[in-house]
A protein has these predicted regions:
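Perimembrane helix-loop-helix junctions
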Residues: 199-219
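Start-transfer (signal-anchor) and selected internal transmembrane alpha helices
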Residues: 1-12
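Juxtamembrane "helix-exit" motif on the non-cytosolic side of transmembrane helices
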Residues: 75-79, 104-108, 131-141
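Transmembrane-helix motifs of polytopic, lipid-linked glycan transferases
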Residues: 90-116, 158
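Short hydrophobic/aromatic helix or loop-helix immediately within or flanking a transmembrane segment
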Residues: 56-90
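Membrane-interface alpha helices of multi-pass inner-membrane proteins
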Residues: 177-200
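Membrane-interface micro-motifs in multi-pass membrane enzymes
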Residues: 26, 117-167, 193
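Extracytoplasmic catalytic/substrate-binding loops of multi-pass membrane glycan-assembly enzymes
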Residues: 17-40, 44-50, 59-71
Length: 219
């Protein structure tokens, strides 16, 4: 429990600093698509169509990181600059969820580690991720860069967690839900930055290889 307390103490100032974040550079370059859609259709929900339009445009004009571009375009400040802090909050929560869930799956589901020991290790690993990031300013508090790298890394960890759980799942309902979640997260991860996408592919191939070997040994 002490490690969990340290994790909480480490996160409090990181979340507190989000209120000082402001839009910068590419936040405007991508956010203008969503803002233009909102002004044209006079609907806050039109930002989604603007994000889809930006993803499609950049696919042909720049690169195929469609899910990153989709989230980049939905910069919270397109609905008002006072909402920009929600972007860094979202990034921090994604990394927190991804790290805690992935380490839980590895330690508890794969290695069958005892609950409290596992929780302590999860907390320590997560603290290290937050504390030793190369640039908190760019990784957490600049929405455009943060969502493209740190946020997508969080999605990637969630995808791998679901993939491992799917390989070990029993029952049609559990398998169906995990399969649906894995497809959705795979689509997001595939359109993220190239490093995360490549890591996800290599890890997925490893999971498939291990599952094939285990299945053959059973039979």
């Amino acid at each position: 429990m002490g490690c969990c307390g340290l994790l909480l103490l480490a996160l409090i100032p990181l979340f507190r600093l989000t209120i000082y974040a402001v839009p910068y550079y590419d936040d405007y370059n991508f956010g203008r698509f969503a803002r233009a859609a909102i002004e044209q259709e006079q609907s806050k929900w039109a930002a989604i169509s603007g994000a889809l339009d930006c993803s499609r445009t950049q696919w042909y004009a720049w690169q195929g990181t469609y899910s990153s571009i989709f989230f980049m375009t939905l910069m919270p400040a397109v609905w008002g600059e006072q909402y920009y802090f929600l972007g860094p909050v979202f990034i921090l929560l994604l990394l927190l969820a991804g790290s805690m869930v992935f380490t839980h799956v590895i330690l508890r589901k794969v290695f069958r580690m005892e609950k409290w020991s596992s929780l302590a290790i999860q907390a320590v690993i997560t603290i290290a991720e937050f504390m030793f990031i190369y640039s908190a300013q760019s990784g957490f508090y600049w929405y455009n860069g943060g969502i493209h790298y740190v946020g997508m890394h969080g999605f990637g960890l969630l995808f791998l967690s679901v993939a491992i759980c799917l390989e070990r799942a029993e029952g049609r309902t559990a398998k169906g839900l995990l399969f649906t979640a894995s497809v959705l997260l795979a689509m997001i991860t595939a359109g993220s930055n190239f490093v995360t996408a490549l890591q996800g592919l290599l890890c997925l191939l490893t999971i498939l290889l291990v599952s094939v070997v285990v299945e053959r040994r059973r039979t």
